[in-house]
C-alpha cells in the first residue's frame, strides 16, 4: 500500500511561512521527523520525499505548480502510482476557521480555496480525505489575497505551531490506524 500526503502552498522563499503555506509547513514537519529530504521532480511538478511506515510507502508532496494549479501534481501522482482516492490526504489552510483550529473531513466543496478547487477539477471528485488548518479571516479591511499571502503575527504563529503539532499527531494516528473515519472521530472532538 502507498499513501500520498499533500501539503498545499506556494513554492519559493517569498511565500515561506505565509498563511497560505501551512500545508507546506506540516509536510516539512513530517519530513523532519522522518529524517527525509525533498527532491524536485519536474515531471510531477512537485517536491517529493518518501519513507516507509509499517510496510507502507508514504509520499510527502509539495506541489510546485503554485496553489491554483495544485490539482495537476496531485492527479499526475495518483495516476502514475495507480493510487485510489482513499490513498490521498490533502493538508491546507482554511480562512473560515479560527487560527490554529483543525478539522478533518472526508469530503466537501472547495469552499473558495483555489488549491482545493484545482484538485477537485483534476481528480473529478470532492470525496477525498483532508485536514484543514484555520488561518482566520482578514482583519481591518485587508483583502483576502493580502491576508493569505502574509506571514502570521507572533501570537498567531504560536497557535499555528501548536496546530501543526496536533495535525502531525492526527496524520501519524491515521497512518498507524489506516482508518480516516476513526481519525476524524478522535481529532475533530
From Swiss-Prot:
Q: Note the InterPro entries from the entry.
A: Pept_tRNA_hydro, Pept_tRNA_hydro_CS, Pept_tRNA_hydro_sf
Q: Which UniProt keywords apply?
A: Cytoplasm, Hydrolase, RNA-binding, tRNA-binding
Q: What is its main location?
A: cytoplasm
Q: Name one Pfam family in it.
A: Pept_tRNA_hydro
Q: Where is this site: Discriminates between blocked and unblocked aminoacyl-tRNA?
A: 10
State its Enzyme Commission number(s): 3.1.1.29
A single GO BP: protein quality control for misfolded or incompletely synthesized proteins
Q: Active site: which residues?
A: 20
Enumerate the catalysed reactions: an N-acyl-L-alpha-aminoacyl-tRNA + H2O = an N-acyl-L-amino acid + a tRNA + H(+)
Q: Which GO terms describe its cellular component?
A: cytoplasm
SUPFAM superfamilies noted in UniProt? Peptidyl-tRNA hydrolase-like
What are the protein's GO molecular function terms?
A: peptidyl-tRNA hydrolase activity; tRNA binding
Q: For binding tRNA, which residues are annotated in this chain's numbering?
A: 15, 66, 68, 114
Q: Where in the cell is it found?
A: Cytoplasm
Q: Where is this site: Stabilizes the basic form of H active site to accept a proton?
A: 93
Entries under PANTHER family matching the protein: PEPTIDYL-TRNA HYDROLASE (PTHR17224:SF1)
Assembly and binders: Monomer.
Name the job this protein performs.
Hydrolyzes ribosome-free peptidyl-tRNAs (with 1 or more amino acids incorporated), which drop off the ribosome during protein synthesis, or as a result of ribosome stalling.
The text of the family note is:
Belongs to the PTH family.
Protein name, entry field:
Peptidyl-tRNA hydrolase
The scientific name of the source species is Streptococcus pneumoniae serotype 4 (strain ATCC BAA-334 / TIGR4)
Name of the gene: pth
Amino acid at each position: 500500500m502507498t499513501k500520498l500526503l499533500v501539503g498545499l502552498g506556494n513554492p519559493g522563499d517569498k511565500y515561506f511561512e505565509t498563511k497560505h503555506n501551512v500545508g507546506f509547513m506540516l509536510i516539512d514537519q513530517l519530513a523532519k521527523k522522518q529524517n527525509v529530504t525533498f527532491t524536485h521532480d519536474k515531471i510531477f511538478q512537485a517536491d517529493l520525499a518518501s519513507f516507509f511506515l509499517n510496510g507502507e510507502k508514504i509520499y510527502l508532496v509539495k506541489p510546485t505548480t503554485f496553489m491554483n494549479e495544485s490539482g495537476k501534481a496531485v492527479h499526475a501522482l495518483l495516476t502514475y502510482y495507480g493510487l485510489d482516492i482513499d490513498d490521498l490526504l490533502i493538508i491546507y489552510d482554511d480562512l473560515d476557521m479560527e487560527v490554529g483550529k483543525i478539522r478533518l473531513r472526508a469530503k466537501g466543496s472547495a469552499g473558495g480555496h483555489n488549491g482545493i478547487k484545482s484538485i477537485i477539477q483534476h481528480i473529478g471528485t470532492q470525496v477525498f480525505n483532508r485536514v484543514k488548518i484555520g488561518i482566520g479571516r482578514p482583519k481591518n479591511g485587508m483583502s483576502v489575497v493580502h491576508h493569505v499571502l502574509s506571514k502570521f503575527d507572533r501570537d498567531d504563529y504560536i497557535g499555528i505551531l501548536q496546530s501543526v503539532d496536533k495535525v502531525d499527531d492526527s496524520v501519524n494516528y491515521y497512518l498507524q490506524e489506516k482508518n480516516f473515519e476513526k481519525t476524524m472521530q478522535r481529532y475533530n472532538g
